[in-house]
Swiss-Prot record:
This is Fluoride-specific ion channel FluC. Keywords: Cell inner membrane, Cell membrane, Ion channel, Ion transport, Membrane, Metal-binding, Sodium, Transmembrane, Transmembrane helix, Transport. Fluoride-specific ion channel. Important for reducing fluoride concentration in the cell, thus reducing its toxicity. Pfam families: CRCB. The keyword Cell inner membrane applies.
Amino acid sequence: MTNVLLVALGGSIGAVLRYLLSIFMIQVFGSSFPFGTLLVNLLGSFLMGAVYALGQLSHISPEIKALIGIGLLGALTTFSTFSNETLLLLQEGLWHKAILNVLLNVTLCLFMVYLGQQLIFSRV
C-alpha cells in the first residue's frame, strides 16, 4: 500500500510540473508548436534514464523508484498529448511541424534516456 501512495504523490507532483512547464513554454514561445510537451518529454526521458541507471546500480530503493520513476515521471511525460498535438498539426495541414514534432520527440527522448543512463553509469 505504501508504494501506491508514493506513486500517487509522485503523480500529483509530476502532473503539476507538466502543467506549469507547459504554460511557461507557451508564454515564452507561443502556441504555434508544442514546445511544452517536447520539454516535459525530454526532461522526463533524461530523468528516467538516470533513475533506471541508479536502479541498476542498486543506489535507490523500490519506494523511490515508485515515487519518481512511475509516479512523478509517469505523470510528467505524456505520449497521449504528444499524439494529439501531432494529429492536430496534421489536421491543420502543418505537415512539416507534425513531422518535426515526431522526429524531435522520438529521437531526442531516446537520446535523453541514453544521456541520463550514461551520466549515472560514468560516475561508478
